[in-house]
Amino acid sequence: MHKRFVMVDGPDGSGKGIIVNALKKWAEQQQIKVFNLRDYCRENNRFPEPEEINDFDAIISSEMSYCWVGNALREEIVRKNNRNYSITSTAHAFSLDREILYNMVIIPALKQGKYVFQERGIISSIVYQPVQGNISLTEIMRLPGNKLALQNSPNLLIISQVAPETIMQRLSQRQKQNKAIFEEINFQRRVEQRYNSQWLKNLFESHGSKVVYLDTNFPKTVEETEKEAIKIWEDFLEKN
């Protein structure tokens, strides 16, 4: 199987969307036909059937998804609404959303040799959920969707790095506040430590991923981040 699965992960406000967009631009410059799964799910409130993506060579994806379980997560479960869903329920919801995404889109696309550029994934559950509540890493990794994702780990994992203080500043400047429960400074500091940990890197390397870090702290510009992301990807392609 071609090594064409790239996952971009990191704290909120760390530039993940910029990096994925850079990979999308790269694909378009290579005359690769791109299917934007996020836009499709927003517009149709469902995942595409396999035949609907046959004519495309690259998929732009993200977690949480933008339909079904993903919408329940975005609009209800992880919002600040004082309904306080348990960490177990939250973890199961993320796992189910992931299981559907992988079975319906990611795995079939990779088997067909398509590129997959995805924002967030199983690494987010591993980083965030033990910080959010009383749940062990072992329990998280045993959930079916999470097991499936680890069995189909990305070939290249780009972790975007930024200081927690910068994250809070960036999030406060966003036009659309998503009201997620994760946007607290102490929470972000703990998240940063986990993303930068050696054990996390070792975990994904043991599942076949190449792990690369991309610093997006000021004064790095959007253009510089995009350029560095493409260089990381092209260097990976050259060696694989």
Summary of predicted features, one role per range:
Residues 124-194:
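A glycine- and Lys/Arg-enriched "phosphate-lid" helix/loop adjacent to the NTP-binding pocket
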Residues 2-5:
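Pre-Walker A (Motif I) flank of P-loop NTPase domains
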Residues 19:
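Hydrophobic positions on the alpha1 helix immediately C-terminal to the Walker A/P-loop
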Residues 8:
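Hydrophobic anchor at the beta1->P-loop junction of P-loop NTPases
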Residues 13:
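Walker A (P-loop) phosphate-binding loop of P-loop NTPases
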Residues 40-142, 148:
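ATP-dependent small-molecule kinase phosphotransfer cores
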Residues 22-26, 30, 165-240:
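NTP-dependent small-molecule kinase module
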Residues 16:
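Conserved lysine of the Walker
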